[in-house]
Amino acid sequence: MAGHSKWANIKRQKARVDAKKGQTFTQLSRAIIVATRNGVPDPAGNFQLRTAIEKAKAAGIPNDNIERAIAKGAGTWENDSAFEEIRYEGYGPGGVAILIEALTDNRNRTAAALRAAFSKNGGNLGETGCVGWMFDHKGVIRLEGTIDEDKLLEASLEGQAQSYEFFDSEEEGQGAEVFTEVSNLERLNKVLQAAGFKVKEAELRWIPTNTLEVSDREQARFLLKLIDTLESLDHVQSVTANFDLVEELMLLDL
């Protein structure tokens, strides 16, 4: 049942993991707003909101800010901007597929900023659907600590997980990521916690169905710069791409 995600996140390969997706207080607060609007303002009955709040607390966001974001999402906060979730798609250098999730109150301004970022780094912003078919939307649960594989396999089968993969590095420590269908994320999370696993994070993630191996140093440099530029944009929540650096490039300071 063990699986391996080749993307397994380019940020992991470049030791950028938990600065993870470079999410700022603003981005995390917006995630709470949208999660509230998509469900109910009570985290007990809204798994998306509950996980958004957990991420915010882990990042050190004060409770007052979290409560304010929930109020905005529930429509009980004055002067509230209407944020909407939008997925943008494009190509990086060498035809690498890039998927961007954004929360924005001005889709034209966000699209213009993304288009500029792509064009300055050898890529181009495409039409909706141009690369989306190259990715699967999955629920991902990240476990921490030393893990017994037999125990994980048993819990994964009970929780109807699709696959899992282990990680062990100086930057991340030890643990595993367990993958499942989006609709099964909350159920699997409960099963894994009940089995005694330490759940660090439960999230939805785009996983590339296939990856392109990048061996050219210049292409890799432009790709990483493009990813960094996209992630730094205010309304961008996440960036996923379908490339994998060869080992020699991972050891270089690009």
Swiss-Prot record:
Keyword hit for Cytoplasm: yes
A GO term from the CC aspect: cytosol
Transcription listed as a keyword: yes
GO BP term, example: regulation of DNA-templated transcription
Pfam families per record: TACO1_YebC_N, Transcrip_reg
Family the entry assigns: Belongs to the TACO1 family.
Name recorded for this polypeptide: Probable transcriptional regulatory protein MAE_13580
Organism: Microcystis aeruginosa (strain NIES-843 / IAM M-2473)
